[in-house]
A protein has these predicted regions:
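Membrane-anchoring alpha-helices and their flanking helix-loop junctions
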Residues: 1-170
Length: 170
């Protein structure tokens, strides 16, 4: 269980850093600033600008649906915790190594995408001509040359590792 907790902490730090560098957090939390992604959603789906619709969406999707998902996602961790008296085995070591590899792969993919998007928008803001991947609008180098969604694949495999931890400990 301690091993799993360490890996979850590493993964959580990575997720927090990735969100923070995109200005996902503000030290002025009392101003009630919202996640930048909601602004984009409201622009694309204008009905969400109606206060009662947004409140219902907030209640049903953000509060209820997402909390339900979090509960379901945590079930493998609960199963692993219930089997916490079992000693660390070779399968735990392999699962841990695999999970670290997927966390690192996800970090590399996110860094590549972040650097690409930052450079692309700097070029656009400076009225530069876009060429290559920037003209296409998406990255095709690094991990992105192997897969269109290396960060998503890594994220899904991290969740598979949680499941494997639950099997290993029970």
């Amino acid at each position: 269980m301690v091993l799993m907790s360490i890996l979850v902490t590493i993964w959580g730090i990575r997720l927090t850093y990735n969100f923070a560098r995109k200005s996902g957090y503000s030290i002025y939390f009392w101003r009630g600033e919202e996640d930048y992604r909601w602004k984009i959603l409201k622009e694309r789906v204008p009905v969400f600008n109606i206060k009662i619709i947004w409140s219902l969406f907030n209640l049903l999707f953000i509060c209820t649906y997402q909390m339900g998902l979090i509960f379901l996602f945590s079930l493998p961790i609960l199963a692993a915790w219930q089997g916490q008296n079992s000693p660390i085995g070779i399968s735990d070591v392999f699962i841990s190594i695999a999970m670290l590899i997927f966390i690192i792969t996800e970090s590399i993919a996110d860094n590549q995408q972040y650097n690409f998007q930052t450079t692309k928008y700097n070029l656009i803001n400076n009225n530069k001509t876009l060429t290559g991947d920037f003209k296409k609008g998406f990255l095709t180098k690094g991990l992105w040359s192997i897969s269109r969604h290396p960060n998503f694949i890594s994220e899904q495999l991290i969740w598979v590792m949680f499941y494997l931890f639950s099997i290993s400990s029970t």
